[in-house]
Amino acid sequence: MARVKRAVNAHKKRRAILEQASGYRGQRSRLYRKAKEQVTHSLVYNYNDRKKRKGDFRQLWIQRINAAARANGITYNRFIQGLKAANVEVDRKILAELAVNDPNAFAALVEVAQKALPSDVNAPKAA
């Protein structure tokens, strides 16, 4: 059986890892083993944080909506409840955009939500 020389592939693999690790501090950018561990962890962090980013943005949108809703005399919870009762299907991203860029349209939505809410908070829901 012919001998297989793997030096070219091994060097290519190591060079690829070290290129990915460029910019890391200390041994993590220079030593293959340390760089490989750090690149693996970095990819895991990257994957997890892409998932986490979605929740972070939702949290930001809710804070913006809540601030604008309170400026219009209603809480976030009652505002969303009123929009659902009025069958207004606008997601939180768009609501946050309206709250920041178009306060008049947001105020109109607040009016719609307030009209759809029962006047008595403790009143039973109509089935």
Curated annotation (Swiss-Prot):
One GO BP annotation of this record: translation
Molecular function in Gene Ontology: rRNA binding; structural constituent of ribosome
Alphabetized InterPro entries for the sequence: Ribosomal_bL20, RIBOSOMAL_L20_CS, Ribosomal_protein_bL20_C
Keyword rRNA-binding: yes
Pfam families named among the record's database cross-references: Ribosomal_L20 (PF00453)
Coiled-coil residue windows: none
Record-level GO cellular component terms: cytosolic large ribosomal subunit
Assigned keywords, A-Z: Ribonucleoprotein, Ribosomal protein, RNA-binding, rRNA-binding
Family according to the record: Belongs to the bacterial ribosomal protein bL20 family.
Role of this protein: Binds directly to 23S ribosomal RNA and is necessary for the in vitro assembly process of the 50S ribosomal subunit. It is not involved in the protein synthesizing functions of that subunit.
Annotated protein name in UniProt: Large ribosomal subunit protein bL20
